[in-house]
Amino acid sequence: MCLFLLLFPYLASGQFLQTVKVGLLFSKDTASVMRAVGYRTSAAAVLVARDRIRAEHLLDQYDFNFTVKFDECTEGLAGGKTVELINHDNVDVIIGPTCNRAGIAVASLAAYYNVPVFQWGLTTAADIGNVSRYPTTVTLSLDTHSMALGVREVLRRFEWDEFVFIYSNDGDEEKCASMKDDLEKMGIENSDVTLAYMVQIQTVTLDALQKALTEVSKRGRIIIACFANGRGFKKAFVASTVLAGMSTDEYMYMFAEPQSRGFYVDEINGGEHYSWDDTDGNFVTGLTPEQIRDAYGKVLYICDNMGLPTTITPEFANFSSQLISRMTEQPFNCVQDCSNSTYKVPATYAGQLFDAFYAYGVALNRSLTQDPTRANLKNGSFVLSDIGMSFQGVGGGTVTLDDTGTRIVQVYMFALNTSLLPYLAASLVINGSEVEYTPFYKSEADLWSVRPLARPICGFSGLECPPDFVKEYLVYTIIAAVIVVLALLAGCAGLLYTMQMKRKEMERQDLLWQVPFIELQQVQSKSKAEASMHSFASGPSTSTKITVESRSETINFIFYYYQQDILAAMKHDLILQFDAEQKAEFRQMRNFDNDNLNKFIGLCLDGPQLFSLWRFCSRGSLSDVISKSSMQMDSFFMFSLIRDISNGLLFIHNSFLKCHGHLTSRCCLIDDRWQIKISGYGLKSVRTFENPKKEDLLWTPPENLRNENEERLPEGDIYSFGIICSEILTRSSAFDLENRKEKPDVIIYQVKKGGHNPMRPSLDTGETVEINPALLHLIRDCWTERPSERPSIEQVRGHLNGMRDGRKSNLMDHVFNMLETYASTLEEEVSDRTKELVEEKKKSDVLLYRMLPKMVADKLKLGQTVEPETFEQVTIFFSDVVQFTTLAGKCTPLQVVTLLNDLYTIFDGIIEQNDVYKVETIGDGYLCVSGLPHRNGNEHIRHIARMSLGFLSSLEFFRVQHLPSERINLRIGINCGSVVAGVVGLTMPRYCLFGDAVNTASRMESNGKPGKIHVTAEANQMLTQVVGGFRTESRGEVIIKGKGVMETYWLLGEQSRISVSAQAPREKTPEPPRRQSVRSISPIIEKMSEETQKGLYSAYKDFNNGNECVS
């Protein structure tokens, strides 16, 4: 029956399988290692691993034959059993042994025989992992060399540059000795960590432990300890720290060893408990578990995954159940010997045995794939030539071997949390000499309250610190303390003073931007009378400046004088209370100083409404200049305006304001030097409550049109900047509103709508100005739909600087050069125009001199006032056409004008022959004077007399064109006397005569006879006695209205000339008047007065002084 079972695999497959002989070395009855690697609780792991190998079809053509030997962890026995397995049993591979000394012996023999060996369990000596000495040995255990590297990384991580080591070989002669060797080697090979002191305890007792702790307290504060497992040594050590008074925050203890359960202790029945609850051992400390647990709070454990709390996964549970049950199978046949309940729990490192055998199966599969000959099964060098692998193990998570067969191990650092419960603090992956540290704690506060120092500040003896300065220099200390207190008081006083002064300074600065309304004086616009007072020499102005006096208030602004400066006060229809943050904003705004920012003066809070005050710019806004200025803009002029706006925006974007938020061309003001100054910035708290006009939204970016509550950003200013640039280049308003059919509402809706081709202004600049295409591209980038795609103001400035073409002149210089060029080109045209002007001026002067006396006209042209002038002796001449009303009734109006023009042309020719000034003609009335404005002595009477005689003689030959049969006759009156002459009126100014002599001359004409020259007694005396040469005849006494009875005369002619009227007209000799009373003669005088007043000449009486003013 047994033979059949042995032959069944071969019969089932139809062919005989090759056999791999496997030698197994175990420790069967050694009590110290039974729980970890005991034969009865671990050997069956090779059968479970064989099943996995078959399931993965790694060695389908091979079967395994197992030979079991027991070395009991002794090197002599292990060496002998190894020789038997190799020479007698002819095995292909040896799995084991499980202890250090036995493992070194087997590894040496395997290297000699070139047999592959896979060790596991407690083989932790670093020498076993030396590939150069033992090239055919693979160890799956965590060695002490790797553990030493992990300790060094932890020490470096917490800046501990020195440590001490306490260990004992009591109960385990191999583990701690190997750990000591590797720590010593690590301290020698690395300068960053030093092993300062080392103590070995021969027999572990409480006294020995306390003595050792007292000794090391003089050499170190970071203490690494190593003791045998399962005998209560570690708990006794921790308890000894309490008894020795060394469980304080000044110390840190570390257990760094392989095959450690950390803060857990295994129980025989498979369970576990905390180390401070361990009852194993004969140590009576007198301490409670709570005291010992508190001391464990100063302990760190560095060990493999055995330190983790036991977790039973389904895979491990299946492995554990098979491990115990299959010990009864071949080749172990452990039935009675394994029936004790002690052997019902798998050994601690049984999983490593599974991993070791499975790793061999993978390595053999690879070697047989390369060379399937039978001879290579036992060739250790060939089997391990491709040993590098990684797989999921049963005993320790992922198993990774490098190309030399050295396992890349992962160890863990465990600590107690604030609740004094174990937790995983960090992970350390050790690959050769490299260590990767991964912390799982949030901060070091999870590990300790204060990190311990490797060396106390005052040294281990406490004598390295300098002596207490206070005790040594008590007097000086007291003096220094007093000085410090006084200094602190002075500092506090200074701080309070500084704060007080700062508060006062803030209040002072607040007074600067809070302008009282009483200190503002409104600019008064000029009255109409003042506006009309222009001299004859003044001409129209061509300046582009805005005279603030021309208008004192607009819809949005009122202009005020403040401290001899003109301010523009922006109106805000609201009343607000400002908090400290807003006041700080106003203070900072008032301190702004930039060439392209309009100065913010402050706010007026106590006026009829809220005013924000800004400096007045004489040329108005950019919008005004574009819409009203006739000044020609070339490309450099436009570029300079755009550059000024970008400079102002750069300052705003880099200030605390971050953005303007409401930038329009109306905010861009222009000063005397044609420099743009941005106004209206800041005042966010004020603008929040204002409703902008539709026209002001034409510059608003689409994102703010869609959401009015969205915060204004610098990208929005860039959009507004692009709209303003389009206004400058096209020399039109935003979106060319005046020449569009759409209203602002429609345009704003289209901009808000957006889309693939959003609404934007035209950039058609015409052919008169050459614009850089790069500038047009920049403007289009500025108003792109997505804010994130718009350039920043720094980028805009960079692009503009690249377009300067090397020109560095400013705009004012450019304007001067442009005006100079313009002046030179117009020089010839001005010269021609000047010649024409001189000719026209001559014509104007001739006309003016005919209307006014030359002397008077010259004064008026110079803008001088013509003062009234008194002339003591002049001769006044009045004439009137007899029965002109009857004659005019026979003519049309045009014929009347023709008649008078023909007549006056003859008269004007006669006047030019004499020193006579023609004052005025009214209808058919004629007024002349001689002796003014140029005085001519007594010759004035001669010139008037000759002119009068000439008038009468010229009528003999004068004929009316349309009435040839009609004859014209004149009545002439002459008087001599004093008059006052002057210019009266602004519109159509006239040179007028004032005086009684004027009225008397008028009465002479009105009381005269047709064809006669009627003169007064004064004129007669001048004619006959003063100048002589004229013949006159007395008319007698005549009643003159306003004069009473006057004696008058007829001028008959000049003695040297033929008399115009040789004889006086015959009149009936009046009867002597009868005596009548004054009362009875009055009606007669009134009737005579009415008859003598007939005529078309009108005289105007001045009721204030009784003089006649003829105009």
UniProtKB/Swiss-Prot annotation:
Q: Which residues lie on this side of the membrane: Cytoplasmic?
A: 495-1111
- Glycosylation annotated at which residues? N65, N130, N318, N340, N365, N379
What transmembrane ranges does the database entry give? 474-494
Give the EC number(s) listed in the UniProt record.
4.6.1.2
A molecular function annotated in GO for this UniProt entry is: GTP binding
List locations, semicolon-separated. Answer: Cell membrane; Cell projection, Cilium
Summarizing the annotation, the consequence of altering H88Q is:
No effect on chemotaxis to alkaline pH. No effect on chemotaxis toward Na+. Normal cilium localization
Q: Domain (Guanylate cyclase): give its ranges.
A: 875-1005
Q: Which residues lie on this side of the membrane: Extracellular?
A: 15-473
Signal peptide span: 1-14
Chain residue ranges for the region called Disordered: 1061-1082
Expression (tissue specificity): Expressed asymmetrically in ASEL sensory neuron.
User: Catalysed reaction per UniProt?
Assistant: GTP = 3',5'-cyclic GMP + diphosphate
Give the way it sits in the membrane.
Single-pass type I membrane protein
- Record carries keyword Phosphoprotein: no
Q: Which PROSITE patterns match?
A: GUANYLATE_CYCLASE_1, GUANYLATE_CYCLASE_2, PROTEIN_KINASE_DOM
In the record, biological process GO terms are: cGMP biosynthetic process; chemosensory behavior; chemotaxis; intracellular signal transduction; receptor guanylyl cyclase signaling pathway; response to alkaline pH; response to lithium ion; response to salt
* Residues annotated to bind ATP: L488, L489, A490, G491, C492, A493, G494, L495, L496, K545
The first-level EC class reads: lyase
Q: Which residues form a coiled coil?
A: none
Record remark: domains: The extracellular domain is required for the direct sensing of alkaline pH. The protein kinase domain is predicted to be catalytically inactive.
Assembly mode: Homodimer.
Protein name as annotated: Receptor-type guanylate cyclase gcy-14
Q: Say which species the protein is native to.
A: Caenorhabditis elegans
Q: What is the lineage of its organism?
A: Eukaryota, Metazoa, Ecdysozoa, Nematoda, Chromadorea
Name of the gene encoding the protein in the UniProt record: gcy-14
